[in-house]
């Protein structure tokens, strides 16, 4: 693994209804980036916020010599689509993704950049002393385990969005055309060298989590169906297993009927119904998984854009001082011109 030279760093932050945390987020993120020896930009993507987030981002981007780039989407497309929109607009050799809720401190950015300079394609993070509820932690652990089994890349915390990506990984992800994606997994599918660092995790100070129970369920389906065909293979295995169990059970019923007579068979009616419901449930699960895959194929065939960018706002460099000519001598306001 060779060191990776970095000239420019981009920070990409998706924003959705975060007007209360934005002033502190901008201040802390810019202060953390000032510690770097590289040039930098802070790309904030407003994902269809219903509060004043877009106006705050626009004002920040319009400041003279501001490092902020404001990307305004026309509606809400979801966290990962917003990040992909930021990837399209950023130009860094290394790109850092960060959530806007300040649960992961921006002060960790220099550590991730230092790891990326060592030559890693992807630098993941693991949340230390995670402040989320058990309702969020346990499903996250199950998802991480399932992702590790599906991708073969052993990372401990796929749910933490504070991550660093090399430019080549960003370009590879932008070349993908699927509508639904999960960026940490997609990045690892292109990465050769990956690592993780331990980062602090704070409680959310403003607002509520944007991941409701229904959104978490949708995210789990995205993880299951958008990155691997393993569930389809498991479905075939389960189907063969259930068919085998059904054949054995039918054989057992025939033998028991021959031994105990028709009376026993009548008493076993409820057992048959129970088994029928089990197999029927398995069939519906399989049909649901097939429906998910077919739905995603339908979305990809339509080839609609993943998002629509309404506008991009960048700061303009400071205008040069006007030249003043006195007695044939030209000067700016910083020069001293003798009368």
Swiss-Prot record:
Topology of the protein relative to the lipid bilayer: Multi-pass membrane protein
UniProt organism field: Pseudomonas fluorescens (strain ATCC BAA-477 / NRRL B-23932 / Pf-5)
Signal sequence range: none
EC number: 2.4.2.53
Main subcellular localisation: membrane
A Pfam family this chain is assigned to: Glycos_transf_2
Organism lineage: Bacteria, Pseudomonadati, Pseudomonadota, Gammaproteobacteria, Pseudomonadales
EC class: transferase
GO cellular component, one term: plasma membrane
Function, in words: Catalyzes the transfer of 4-deoxy-4-formamido-L-arabinose from UDP to undecaprenyl phosphate. The modified arabinose is attached to lipid A and is required for resistance to polymyxin and cationic antimicrobial peptides.
Catalytic activity reported: UDP-4-deoxy-4-formamido-beta-L-arabinose + di-trans,octa-cis-undecaprenyl phosphate = 4-deoxy-4-formamido-alpha-L-arabinopyranosyl di-trans,octa-cis-undecaprenyl phosphate + UDP
A Gene Ontology molecular function term of the record: phosphotransferase activity, for other substituted phosphate groups
Biological process annotations from GO: 4-amino-4-deoxy-alpha-L-arabinopyranosyl undecaprenyl phosphate biosynthetic process; lipid A biosynthetic process; lipopolysaccharide biosynthetic process; response to antibiotic
Membrane-spanning segments: 235-255, 270-290
Family in the record: Belongs to the glycosyltransferase 2 family.
Record localization: Cell inner membrane
Pathway entry: Glycolipid biosynthesis; 4-amino-4-deoxy-alpha-L-arabinose undecaprenyl phosphate biosynthesis; 4-amino-4-deoxy-alpha-L-arabinose undecaprenyl phosphate from UDP-4-deoxy-4-formamido-beta-L-arabinose and undecaprenyl phosphate: step 1/2; Bacterial outer membrane biogenesis; lipopolysaccharide biosynthesis
Protein name stated in the entry: Undecaprenyl-phosphate 4-deoxy-4-formamido-L-arabinose transferase
Keywords: Antibiotic resistance, Cell inner membrane, Cell membrane, Glycosyltransferase, Lipid A biosynthesis, Lipid biosynthesis, Lipid metabolism, Lipopolysaccharide biosynthesis, Membrane, Transferase, Transmembrane, Transmembrane helix
């Amino acid at each position: 693994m060779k060191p990776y030279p970095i000239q420019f760093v981009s920070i990409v932050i998706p924003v959705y209804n975060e007007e209360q945390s934005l002033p502190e987020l901008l201040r802390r993120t810019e202060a953390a980036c000032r510690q770097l020896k590289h040039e930098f930009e802070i790309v904030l993507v407003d994902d269809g916020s219903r509060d004043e987030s877009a106006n705050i981002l626009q004002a920040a981007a319009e400041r003279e010599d501001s490092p902020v780039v404001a990307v305004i989407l026309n509606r809400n497309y979801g966290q990962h689509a917003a990040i992909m929109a930021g990837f399209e607009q950023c130009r860094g050799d290394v790109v850092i993704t960060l959530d806007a809720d300040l649960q992961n401190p921006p002060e960790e950015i220099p550590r991730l950049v230092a790891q990326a300079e060592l030559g890693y394609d992807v630098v993941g993070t693991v949340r230390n002393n995670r402040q989320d509820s058990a309702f969020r932690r346990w499903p996250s652990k199950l998802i991480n385990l399932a992702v590790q089994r599906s991708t073969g890349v052993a990372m401990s915390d796929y749910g933490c969005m504070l991550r660093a990506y090399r430019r080549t990984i960003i370009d590879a992800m932008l070349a993908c055309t699927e509508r639904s994606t999960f960026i940490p997994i997609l990045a690892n599918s292109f990465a050769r060298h990956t690592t993780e660092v331990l980062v602090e995790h704070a409680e959310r100070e403003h607002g509520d989590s944007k991941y409701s129970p229904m959104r978490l369920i949708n995210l789990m389906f995205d993880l299951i169906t958008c990155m691997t065909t393993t569930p389809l293979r498991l479905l075939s295995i389960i189907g063969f297993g259930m068919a085998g169990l059904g054949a054995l059970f039918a054989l057992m019923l025939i033998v028991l009927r021959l031994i105990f007579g028709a009376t026993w068979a009548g008493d076993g009616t409820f057992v048959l119904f129970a088994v029928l419901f089990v197999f029927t449930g398995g069939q519906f699960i399989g049909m649901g998984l097939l429906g998910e895959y077919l739905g995603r194929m339908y979305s990809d065939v339509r080839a609609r854009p993943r998002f629509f960018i309404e506008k991009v706002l960048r700061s303009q460099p400071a205008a040069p001082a006007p030249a003043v000519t006195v007695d044939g001598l030209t000067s700016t306001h910083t020069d001293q011109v003798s009368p």
